[in-house]
Amino acid sequence: MGKAKNKKKFLKNRKQVLVPGTLFVHSRKGFGFVSPDQPELYPFDIFISASDLKGALDGDHVLVALPFSLRGGEKRKGVIHKVLSRGKTVLVGTIVSLINPTLAMVYVNTIGPEHPLKAELLPKRTYKLGDRLLLKTPVWKENYPSREPPPLAMLEFIGNISNAKTDFPVIKAEFSITEEFPDAVVQEASQFLQKHVTQALHSRKDLRDLLCFTIDSSSAKDFDDAVSLTYDHEGNYILGVHIADVSHYVTPNSALDREAAKRCNSIYFPGKVIPMLPSALSDNLCSLKPNVDRLAVSVFMTFSKEGFLSDYRILRSVIRSKYRMTYDEVDEIIEKKQTHPISKTILKMAELSRIFSDIREQRGCTRLVLPSFTMSLDNLQEPVALIENKQTAAHKLIEEFMLKANEVIAYHISHQGITMPFRTHEPPNEESLLVFQETAKAMGFTITQTPAQEPDYQYLLQETTAGHPLEPILHSQFVRSMKTASYSTENKGHYGLCLDYYTHFTSPIRRYVDLIVHRLLFHPLSVEEEHLEQIVRACSSQERIAAKAEGAFVNIKKARFLKKFIEEQPATLYKAFIITASPEGISFVLPEFCHEGFIPAAKLPQAYVLQTKIGLEELPEHLRPGAVISVQLASVTLLTQSIEWTLVEATTKAKAKRTSKKKKTESVTTKEKKKSPAKKKKGATKTKKGSGKN
């Protein structure tokens, strides 16, 4: 087994180390990454190819073999050595062939199409191709796949893949999502009544006469933040951010707390939310509804007319929101000067928001233009439209105000000497950044190859691409080159926001970390430091799982959506932009569907194959990255969510701006440093505020 060295808990021999961690598998491409249990010792993810999974499944706790002689610049690639424990007790299988009435071959999404498995079927039912089944996870064997595993045991019939209503039960099972709350949790939540708000008034600041209000989407049910704006005697802004005081109701080690700690966050699907807290709290007592008294944590921040922070106060309060405003209503006031009782306040808020945005730009932070959409579903859960998420002035206003509150809270707690969960985002590594710069160069953009840590890098990216048709595509590629934001008790700063201090505080209804931050503000001894380390790891992990579940649900719905197009409009041509061209083929983006596609070289003109063998620089302009092409849907397979395309014709290349002027970064004296079927519709807003990706 080998000896422990320097307290590192891994097994060692001459050639490799065995590192424990959690496996995350790409549901369609088959490869995975292992996130080590000890990030302080292994501050990187380990890549696992599909052929090296050795029977391990998404979510498994594994031991991965990593070459011991790995040098600094080498890719961290490992092989699964052992499955320590299964991450899931059940799998979802889809029947691809029937052997006999009680035995079938099934496709399991987390294993891949190359390895269909046998499954024993429950009696007293007639099965057909496409039936979705709930199966018991097999025991891991060390000799996998040298010996055929025994048939999987069927637990439950879900429905046929042709029925769109089966998609959600499948996602729930695949990602171990619990929708219903235990009786003890529901009972505990229901014991709180409006009278508890009145009873708490004597120990809080009474802000019920303050003009504050919420700004959310028209479909929102949980309102966890309200805003206010007043002025001091010198004319400085006093911005108030008022957050629902969830910690008053969800106390340490209560049934509510234990359940919230399991879930870590709410999960958002098109038309459906799996909340972190029962509706008695999330949609009622903790929701800052208009004209009712609510418990809150209020942060008052004083800013100069130039937008720099000079003072702040944090207190527990009782507020009474005066209005429930929607993004659309606020935009009408800002852009069209629509008359409203609070229009003057909103216009001043918009003014302050623009000042904050300018300061962000001065310190080198840019607002990335990223394509985003919401899937609209009908009563049968069939997709009927893709609705573009438009980032409006109202969205930017709330985003800027929440960023300020999160920054101030992080600064305040950390300067009390209290260990806390930071929201950290490290700069891209050099290798990833070079790949991005090569992609940009291939598209015709020249971005100065300065270190990503320099404050002007993001600004240069914005200046180089601003207003160009390829802007959202290139910005998406830049985001992919960056590391994923996560939670940590070590303050590493936030690269994407260019901030020295940052945490999550503004959404305790839907994020457990925010709830912990609230406790640290007023009862820091209630959070044990050792327990906090476990919390940040669990919340980072659950955040990734939630994102994968949300993405998997959207993928199957998008496949259904495009399948309708190929059935009803098979000859339709779609405009696309080439992202990369390689000997393997071309990848491209279809803005109309916010979708990335790929055409293998075998299905491209023979000239393409010959030219890529000579060198990519020999490709004609109309087949190089950045070129505009026309593609046609060839096939859609619901089982694997595989979408195939055909290149129909090439048109012209979108001309990129080759140079940009470097804007001088102004010094900031305060800590102001461092989201037929109908086609896509415009003008819709996001259904949830602040995705939490920052």
From Swiss-Prot:
Subcellular location: Cytoplasm
Domain of life of the organism encoding this protein: Bacteria
Enzyme Commission numbers on file: 3.1.13.1
Database matches in Gene3D superfamilies: Nucleic acid-binding proteins (2.40.50.140)
Domain S1 motif residue range list: 571-648
Any one Gene Ontology BP term: mRNA catabolic process
Biased composition range(s): Basic residues: 654-664, 672-694
Record PROSITE patterns: RIBONUCLEASE_II
Family (UniProt): Belongs to the RNR ribonuclease family. RNase R subfamily.
Name of the protein described by the UniProt record: Ribonuclease R
Lineage: Bacteria, Pseudomonadati, Chlamydiota, Chlamydiia, Chlamydiales
